[in-house]
Amino acid sequence: MKFATTLVTGLVSLASLASARITGITLPTKIGVNEVFNVTIKSENYIQSIADIAFAFGVIQPQYADAGSLGMYLVGESFLGPTFSNQISDFIVPVGPIPDNVPKGETLFNAALFSLLGSRFAPTTFIWNATVTLQNTTDYSQTITSTIPLTFDYYPG
């Protein structure tokens, strides 16, 4: 009985050390202007603690896109904080609406995540993007996932 109690206590303390990181985004390939739509935030187990602070979302026509920018139109933001930081399961955030003055057709959707990494809380920004089509209504029947971020790190020396 003592072994079982020790084992359970050890597993509980290991579970409290569980950490996760955000690994990408999934969103509809066809997004309606003037509509709020859902973006799934992908996550997985990770070896260290990460304090995920907030997401910002933007769109831009591909021919005007610059690496590292959100685009010409800021279309949403989401504070994550302790509720969604270090969460091992995927979760959904509402985004939008994308204004109707954004040209319909092929558009680059960008998501920037500001996080603090490790025991020294090193600030880092991750940016994921996906090419989507802007149209009259959102269609959830097809989605696109982006899992390779552009990363901007600052590590104190």
State the predicted function of each range.
Residues 17-42, 47, 152:
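N-terminal edge beta-strand
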Residues 59-72:
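Short aromatic-acidic-glycine turn motif
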Residues 54-58:
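Beta-strand signatures of extracellular beta-sandwich domains
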Residues 90-136:
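Internal, hydrophobic beta-strand segments that form the core of beta-sheet-rich folds
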Residues 28, 60-62, 94-100:
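Proline-anchored loop/turn motifs at beta-strand termini and strand-loop-strand connectors
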